[in-house]
Amino acid sequence: MRDGPHRTEEGIFVAAGPASHEHAEFRAREGQEIAAEMLRHNQSLQQAAAEIDSIRAGATPAFQARLQARLSELLSGSQIEPQRLAQEAAVLADRSDVQEEIARLKIHAAQLDALITAGGEMGKKLDFLLQEMNRETNTILSKTSGIGDVGLRITELGLACKSHIEKIREQSLNVE
């Protein structure tokens, strides 16, 4: 057995071993709980996106009615050809459709699930996915504003999506 400072070092390592192991176990459990919380928020986001997708068809008639009323108001006494009017209305309707944004939001949410489930280093990938999800949600919100009750419901769901994205981002700050 050694004497002096070497014996003290060995004693410290022997005493610290169990505490270090317990700390590692605690951090692993905490990481699992944070990942589960992130997955729960992502699941809620996916449910909101699915609901937006299911009610977006209801937004089309509301948008058409609003567009028709607005065009009638603007065109009273105007000499615009009906064919030209139909083309412009089709372009405007296409710009207000959120199907592509919903599809991309769902894809990003599935990628987020896979990333969290795989574990390991998430850093920049997680940041990128959350940024893209936020961008798609913002686009959905901007395209569906002002289309009546359907638009209000989509706005509620879009804001819920943004809230879940932010909660996932906050939880990600607790993961190393």
Stretches with model-predicted labels:
Residues 1-176:
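N-terminal intrinsically disordered, cationic/polar leader segments
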